[in-house]
């Protein structure tokens, strides 16, 4: 379309504005000291471990909320936390409860928080976890939260090695009743797994978007909705970066999760790439995408049904988690199934799968997970793989700045993970994870995470996090042994540290 249409899309990309480096900190400092704040509307938006604490309380049946979409709103959860007493809980959930209550009470007194953090590693990381190593080698971040009446916001200024500066994880939100309207970007994670999500994870940089979401994830007081149990809904329209095959591609994202019976949580996720430079991107075009209208793959005005293809690049699917008490501890079974193409309005094909199991042993949370994104193309005449996260029009794939928006291990990857989380009574954290990976076994069209055409990897990673007054220090490392076709096995090690200082 012409430039007139491009101007109409400015709102979708308003958080992608680039500024010169000499203005970057000046802009932030002016806002930093002029805004009085409270705490974030979401749990763990600055400290992801708080989300894992919340999951612990839900698994132990202490909190009644739907928590498979990160981040979860504080509203409704905070009221339940304030009623809990330490002496009534077993050791593991009592530690998580105290961490969450401490965070909540501290920020009520402080009227918000301002944080400066520095992350440094010996190298860039190929794989990113929910709460561990980051992708970039060096990042300086300054964050300020603020709150005024129904308004809430966060300004997050980031400066990376090489001189790039951006405002990822900055947002402005307005709450009305049980709903929330947000403009900006926020790390998200959709699904019950800890090592990866097939559709939305924090592996890639957060997508700037306009979001309309429920402002709580607890039971509704509406009698017509009470049968859902605790539930959460979000719908978002975002815009990807300009440095891709189709610049400024739009991204539609929608998620609904609910807990209809005690111990069971179910979720439905959907995302669709559409628009961008050279592609139709009006409101009517978006409506055609979300109503699954078709076009001829050969570009003709009419064609046989076999040549019809849905507009846009769709991913959609389901996830579940069922927790039960066995031997006086929770056992959780969970899974996720996300497909890329649809035969009709409801039958999704080209499916990738993830399954996991978690429980608590010797004071630790232990989880085992397996996923497979080796997916045969439903429209291919052979058993060709290399289709997941890929698209004939959107050649950069379901990625942002080269990293998959979904799985940390990208497409054509088999993953097996064993992990341990330990929360200490003094607030310290320990995580250890072992990954066994097989990447691009068919040696065709390797994903960006590969060092060669095909690779087998055994990886050990972990971190220890401790608080010292207003300081929060995380030390971690990863070591991986990779076997690449026609090359000697190679061992790579990475050490990282993240230091956060609370300024108020």
Task: Locate predicted features.
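Signature for the C-terminal beta-barrel architecture of outer-membrane proteins
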Residues: 189, 210-394, 411-412, 416-418, ...
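Outer-membrane beta-barrel "beta-signal"
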Residues: 209-212, 256, 395, 466, ...
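Well-ordered mid-protein domain cores that form the structural environment of catalytic cofactors
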Residues: 133-227
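Short loop/turn motifs that connect adjacent beta-strands in outer-membrane beta-barrel proteins
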Residues: 66-68, 89-91, 103-113, 147-153, ...
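Transmembrane beta-strands of outer-membrane beta-barrel pores
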Residues: 120-124, 148-150, 157-163, 176-178, ...
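N-terminal secretory signal peptides that target proteins for export/translocation
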Residues: 1-21
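N-terminal periplasmic/intermembrane-space "pro-region" immediately following the signal or transit peptide
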Residues: 38-131
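N-terminal signal peptide c-region/cleavage motif recognized by signal peptidases
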Residues: 34-36
